[in-house]
Amino acid sequence: MPEDVQNRTRIKSERYESGVIPYAKMGYWDADYNVKDTDILALFRITPQPGVDPVEARAAVAGESSTATWTVVWTDLLTACDIYRAKAYRVDPVPGTSDQFFAYIAYECDLFEEGSLANLTASIIGNVFGFKAVKALRLEDMRIPYAYLKTFQGPATGVVVERERLDKFGRPLLGATVKPKLGLSGKNYGRVVYEGLAGGLDFLKDDENINSQPFMRWKERFLYCMEGVNRAAAATGEVKGSYLNITAATMEQMYERAEYAHSIGSVIVMIDLVIGYTAIQSMAIWARKYEMILHLHRAGNSTYARQKNHGINFRVICKWMRMCGVDHIHAGTVVGKLEGDPLMVKGFYNSLLLTHLKINLAEGLFFDMDWAALRKCVPVASGGIHCGQMHQLLYYLGDDVVLQFGGGTIGHPDGIQSGATANRVALESMVLARNEGRDYVGEGPEILRRAAATCGPLKAALDLWKDITFDYTSTDTPDFVEVATESR
């Protein structure tokens, strides 16, 4: 028996120090820890309770999100506890606050089951958010190591393959959500789909809460939607689609709906974030098997992602969903009706689209991270946007995005098809101006005005919505100021 083990186990009183010992003293705080390439790293914003030592608070978060309980247990000696303990290794004050701290915590990769987001999150966010020693806690960012990423499949389709299937390049994709989201009959619902696609959109979609209600059962909706898709595709010569929401009460029902959607020719299905991580991963595996695009609506995310000091930053959700394997996820608009600071949204989009992330504190990216060849996930911009904002949308969000104009299509005074045409003409006019090297952001309103001179639907839309903005201060704003570097 090794001498150190012999010494630890020889006398009962010397085996371990029993009782309640501060987490920092137990080894959950280690300022000298050398981070390994295989470590999973998490960045928490911690607000300790009054009177709680900040060092102890960050050690407590590390302990309660890994191996600790409230008292020392002798069974620690039966494990490689020194390895398996999470290590809080760095702490920084949050700029502009006196009681908040950024705590960097490293987790041994072997603490987590391969390819299981449910298991990863059971530790990282499972119990610690209710811990009394902290007044508030927010998971701001994570670095998932290459070795652990390779146990996840990532998006089944990704940006490049989706564009190839649709034969749409060099511009954002265009979509719309059927409105009203609830109450339409199947036939009227399908008519909305046809009108939007025939007018120039690439996609129509179900909203998050349309499943299989008494006014329209799911199979009826699927059939009428696909009739609209097929007729619009035949009329325009373009590949079209409609996101069919397969969200249901059980996995068996979701598989049934997904398989039926596939059997009638749909190229895309949709799920909601509220179905849970295991269900999302299961549907992503199914989508890859059947070569279907998988769209994820982030329903419910703001219940924990919007508040500044408690919950989970949405950039973490973006990373988790890319790991799970969804092809689309709603990720903010900047200019629409929903929460979205420009820099924060840029951080979300970069987390979904870049192959390698670099530290960018202004965007909320605290770690370098290689995505290990997982495919890109297409961000979706939806919620209170209209064609008069097209120059801003193109500037903030770029090409690899789905722009979804629900009310901005279906609320057009001349009808749904005119609304779709207005959006398509506005987008193509703005992309053309950008490709010509013009200042499309500064000249945006004038570019749209000139395009509207020969497009009645666009003129009507601009006249109707020209003064509509949602200029509210975002709740989640950057903690760090973006600094311009001097060019040399």
UniProtKB/Swiss-Prot annotation:
It comes from the Eukaryota. One of its GO terms (cellular component) is chloroplast. Its cofactor is Mg(2+). It catalyses: 2 (2R)-3-phosphoglycerate + 2 H(+) = D-ribulose 1,5-bisphosphate + CO2 + H2O; D-ribulose 1,5-bisphosphate + O2 = 2-phosphoglycolate + (2R)-3-phosphoglycerate + 2 H(+). It holds the Pfam family RuBisCO_large. The active site is at K179 (proton acceptor), H297 (proton acceptor). The record marks K337 as: Transition state stabilizer. Binds 1 Mg(2+) ion per subunit. One of its GO terms (biological process) is reductive pentose-phosphate cycle. Heterohexadecamer of 8 large chains and 8 small chains. HAMAP family: RuBisCO_L_type1 (MF_01338). Belongs to the RuBisCO large chain family. Type I subfamily. This is Ribulose bisphosphate carboxylase large chain. It comes from Pylaiella littoralis (Seaweed). The gene is rbcL.
